[in-house]
Amino acid sequence: WRDAEAAGVIGHEEMVARIRRSLEMLLASGVTAVRSHINVGGPVSTRYLVAAIEAAATFRQRMDIEFVALTYMPMSGEGSDINLAALNDAIELGVEVIGGCPHLEPDSDSCVSKVFELAERHQRKVDLHVDETLDPSALTINDVVRYSRGSGILTTASHCVSLGMLPVEQVQPLAESVAAAAVSIVALPQTNLFLQGRDDPVATPRGLTAIHALLEAGVNLVAGADNAQDPFNFVGRNDPFETAALMVMAGHMLPREAFATISSNSRKALGMPEVSIQVGQPADLLAVRAGSTRQAIAEAPADRIVLKGGQVVARTSAMSEFPPVIT
């Protein structure tokens, strides 16, 4: 976007249109709650966030939408003023979640400290890009755990790829500390599978977080899509069933476990009440033509009815025809 904007190829209206199209795809797929990271700071200031807020306005009665201010580096020390100013502007604009990339910062501890300081001051949630690398020594998740513990701030750590590179004896106590701090971990299979492991042509790592160690420790494990049809992931259709299928295939999860990562676990990470088929529960539901969770993930049926608060907010129908063959 930044390069295209500088070249005059894409402007505000085009950004708004693209975001609306993405939200339409999500809603049609059955998504009634979404969190998206928007670059804030540096040369873009809050322009992308302004476009996202405008695009989301027409969808807010159909789905819950919150934006993360993914703050440019650095967030502390020399050169941080412009980024922190943009972050404060984003907070004024109403961004719900504060984010950053501590593992890419010159001082990860100061970055995480600043994020939690602002989150506490402005009563915001925290969602950080954490350790998106195959380097097992990159463990800024420890900083996130330390600041999250006892803070009362709803905290999410996305990616956490390096955890998947650790031996069991090292990852187990770390996973237990994540669970104790009530930090949700988000695996992002589409983008992590595409980006990670390019320097390892033999026995290429999958680039996913330590899925089973985290689950065994009681961590709230979530799965998301991250990028869709951009330079970081050329494909992707904004369909949670695609994400769940990758968690089954690449993460060796059972279908019911994978489905939880895109549904109930995701709502928990967002601070939303759990949904169950009971009187009095939120009627945020998706109806698909499938006889089981496994079948729904495997076939990702196109026919879908999406309900939000008991009202139908999206409906998709598809028809297959097999005309007679002329012989």
Model-derived regions: residue spans:
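Active-site-proximal loop/turn and secondary-structure-junction residues that shape catalytic pockets
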Residues: 40-42, 69-75, 103-104, 132-136, ...
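Short beta-strand segments at enzyme active-site cores
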Residues: 31-37, 65-68, 187, 223-225
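His/Asp/Glu-enriched, well-ordered alpha-helical/loop segment
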Residues: 125, 146-155, 191, 195, ...
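C-terminal cap of metal-dependent C-N hydrolases
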Residues: 264, 279-327
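Active-site mouth loops of central-metabolism enzymes
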Residues: 1-18, 68-81, 101-105
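Short glycine-rich or small-residue beta-strand-to-loop segments that form or flank ligand, phosphate
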Residues: 35-40, 127-129
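Alpha-helical scaffold segments that flank or form the walls of functional sites
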Residues: 1-37, 46-58, 85-92
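Histidine/acidic residue-rich metal-binding segments in metalloenzymes
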Residues: 47-61, 78-158, 162-184, 201-223, ...
